[in-house]
């Protein structure tokens, strides 16, 4: 499931960001993948006369849990590297971990969003028609 580009309580919102997504030094590639994802969602809602779409709280919570689980792979690195901006001066915070990158890397993240689209029914989004 991938609901990282929306947030509960903000209908019809799509977010393009590095937070909770696959970090890559080739930023245009990340934008391209996120654009494909957004275009798929928008095409679906237009084709199905959806008036509003919004991520469910349960789906958002599940995605944040995924981010936190995968962040553990990076936590040792953040705690042991030279203090600086990216590790809160050597003290990684829960907020920083939650708002970090998808811990499986960009290739895995792009596959996750492709697999989500392949399901075809926008799981985790509440769709209101009319």
Describe the residue ranges of each PLM region.
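C-terminal, flexible cofactor-proximal segment of oxidoreductases
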Residues: 14-130
């Amino acid at each position: 499931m991938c609901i990282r580009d929306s947030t509960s309580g903000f209908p019809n919102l799509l977010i393009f960001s590095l937070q909770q997504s696959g970090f890559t030094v080739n930023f245009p590639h990340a934008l391209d993948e996120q654009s494909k994802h957004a275009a798929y969602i928008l095409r679906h809602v237009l084709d199905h006369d959806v008036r509003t779409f919004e991520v469910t709280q349960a789906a958002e919570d599940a995605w944040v849990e995924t981010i936190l689980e995968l962040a553990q792979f990076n936590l040792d690195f953040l705690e042991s590297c030279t203090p600086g901006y990216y590790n809160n001066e050597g003290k990684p915070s829960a907020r920083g971990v939650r708002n970090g990158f998808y811990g499986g890397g960009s290739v895995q993240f792009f596959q996750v969003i492709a697999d989500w689209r392949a399901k075809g029914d926008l799981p985790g989004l509440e769709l209101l028609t009319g």
